[in-house]
Amino acid sequence: TVKYEWAYGTPNPSSSAVYPIKGDLKVISTDPNIRYTFTRVGNYIMRLKIDNGESIVFKFYTLNVNSGLDEGILILNTDDQDHSLLTFIKTRTPEEEEEGAQEIYEDIVGMINPGIEITKGVDLYIANKNSEGNYPDLVVSSADDKGSIISMDPRNFELKKVLKVEELYPGVKCLNFAGFSSSASGRYTMMNGTDGAIYRYDLLTNDVALRTDSRNLGVEKAYYGTFDDDHYHFFYKESVIYAPSYAKIDSTSVASGSSLTDYKIVNMVFKRRGVRELWVITRRKSDNNIVLHKMSSTFTQYAKRLDYAETEPMAMDENSVMITTRRSAQMYYNYDNKVYRWDYASRIPTINSKPAITPPAGEEITTLGRSYDENYLYVGTYNPARSGKKGSLYIYDFATQNLVKSYEGIVDKPVKILYKYRM
């Protein structure tokens, strides 16, 4: 008589492990043909044991259990009453594409977690993959009366924790998340608070901690760049950029900021391909000239790359959202309801330059984003004259600037757009 035993466990993350399963096994069947429903998403190793009385054979199978909500576009959006929603546009399978089917979940947070609401949504962030191939958190920050940060499992949107920042640091809310970092002590995203200080949001414990050496810095904005799989955090105010260490949070002093004393920072962008470079767009205080600086790879020194007088108003300001791509040596940004394309070392487009993209009449650009494969640019818009939902998403090809797809009137005013990639 042949005996069968099906069991499963979690994968052993060590590449040198002799056995592929970590920890205990759960036996789920002794039938030749297995029928079993998993109740949790995740990665598993299934083991089949076959015993004919004379020999025993083991076979192993890798299983990826998904929720059906594992890939698509996320749009954080807010209405006139400051009620925010996280809308999810599920990526279609080839079969669904052929049928023309589309799944849009207007309020994915409330659908999965009844009773959980977002007020005054500010920022949205998905952490990078960790060593086991999973990303630990999807987080949404808000400017509600508690400074709430909502943490969810990005695979299925299940609530992990609602952290009320103001209960730990009175009067403080998160203005922006600033990229992902990891060290021997954990994984975290940096963020800047409304008090001008820098904080660390721990993605393992879902807690927040003040970086004490930043208490009196008065930073106004956060920016993060990515190069390969590395993230770089930058916090800045009028003429000073702070670049905290990327490994251990306390290994260097953030207070030793890199100063551009004679200039006022307009915006900055981290190059996505070629070499690791931070470009800083400034105005010289003495003559209002536009000056482009390239920051060194150590982020401590500047090289002036372009210095010119403004003959026409520059089509860029501190509110321009900068979007880079590995597919091009150029980047995109928005200004005055248009999208411009810019080559880092060249002059900034002016208000009379031809834009790369102009949205349909009546649409006001509120934010930009990009697809995970970096082939597409997302343009979030708001049309106050539209009935019903006033927000839309337009998707353009990075290379050609052609419109690929539009979703009109599906959200309120878009605040942040991200692509949630498959685990």
Q: Which residues are covered by each model-predicted region?
A:
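Beta-strand initiation motifs
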Residues: 14-17, 94-106, 156-162, 205-212, ...
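Tryptophan-paired
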Residues: 98-136, 147-153, 160-163
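Acidic/polar, low-complexity intrinsically disordered N-terminal segments immediately downstream
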Residues: 1-116, 382-401, 406-410, 415-423
